[in-house]
Amino acid sequence: MAFSEELRELAERVSNWGRWGDDDQAGTGNLLTPEAARRGAACVVDGAALPLALPLLGEGKGVQVGQPAGRLNAVLTFTTMNERDPMAPGIWTGCDDQLTMSTSAGTHIDALSHVAYDDLLYNNRSTDTIGAASGATWCGAEQLRPISTRAILADVPRTLGIDWMEPGQAVTADVLDACIERAGVAPEPGDVLLIRTGDVRYYLNGDRRRYAVGEN
């Protein structure tokens, strides 16, 4: 399905192609500056860490359900089990293992080479820059900047006075503005916006397919 003319015009208006030069491969990652990192560090009050991870292993726990095709949940294989090191006999034993998984098996960050439109990647480069043997020679994951910055939580359900968003309910610019106003924080270049929809309830209630692909 082709993009509408309205969406094309919007994309051109907010495009960052050429903003940091024609040879740039980091995009808005260029905004992740030392100043942005210091701004994030200055927000720490009590140092509490909030885990956001979901299980990758275990029957019925991985988030992948076979759609899109080729995305598999992680498979754990033990390669050594309580084996003695021949270089240190009688001193210690160890275990080792390996994970076989799709790179999209769980939470991840897409490189700018992940998707294209009209056969063009970020900064007007052809998808011909991607090969099965060479990988992405333009905008590969190695071009991603380290992320150490301030995050702003846009809690959509709480802002709208609901428990979670329903299928088909849009997160509009006005909704995000209301979330940010509620958070009481003025966004600055290099900040990260964390959008909560409440959709994880499907996963927690055992409906992995609804969580993964948005349908029953």
PLM regions: where:
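Active-/binding-site microenvironments in catalytic and ligand-binding cores
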Residues: 1-216
